[in-house]
């Protein structure tokens, strides 16, 4: 079966680089499924989970806090400020950070601060949801 090369890169490190049969990720207008030979595409992505079905049938799940997607017929590149492997997600930590952000929202004084905190809240909510869904024993529904 044909494969495509997938790179998921955060501001800090390369999170995944390898061959895959299929990639699913949260596009700006909904979920995107990418197969080998896909039409070239550049798009923003929303916070959520990137699911990679590796060439060996294994699966990688990576939380991204939004970013940019580039698709070429033989490759997929995901660039995100924050990308976290599913095994490293911590729902309790994300919920605690969300509580702090909600407090910051209550104290925000201007539109710029409010917009920044609302974006952070959306990312933290997506991170907590991804952690809950990808928790060992739950599967990736």
From Swiss-Prot:
Keyword Cell inner membrane in record: yes
InterPro entries reported in the protein's UniProt record: ATP_F1_dsu/esu_C_sf, ATP_synth_F1_dsu/esu, ATP_synth_F1_dsu/esu_N, ATPsynth_dsu/esu_N
UniProt superkingdom: Bacteria
Disulfide bonds: none
GO cellular component, one term: proton-transporting ATP synthase complex
A Pfam family recorded for this sequence: ATP-synt_DE_N
Main location class: membrane
Subcellular localization: Cell inner membrane
Assigned keywords, A-Z: ATP synthesis, Cell inner membrane, Cell membrane, CF(1), Hydrogen ion transport, Ion transport, Membrane, Transport
Gene Ontology molecular function: any one: proton-transporting ATP synthase activity, rotational mechanism
Membrane topology: Peripheral membrane protein
The UniProt record lists the keyword Chloroplast: no
HAMAP family: ATP_synth_epsil_bac
Protein purpose: Produces ATP from ADP in the presence of a proton gradient across the membrane.
PANTHER family, alphabetized: ATP SYNTHASE DELTA/EPSILON CHAIN, ATP SYNTHASE EPSILON CHAIN, CHLOROPLASTIC
Family per record: Belongs to the ATPase epsilon chain family.
Quaternary structure annotation from Swiss-Prot or TrEMBL: F-type ATPases have 2 components, CF(1) - the catalytic core - and CF(0) - the membrane proton channel. CF(1) has five subunits: alpha(3), beta(3), gamma(1), delta(1), epsilon(1). CF(0) has three main subunits: a, b and c.
Protein name per Swiss-Prot or TrEMBL: ATP synthase epsilon chain
Gene: atpC
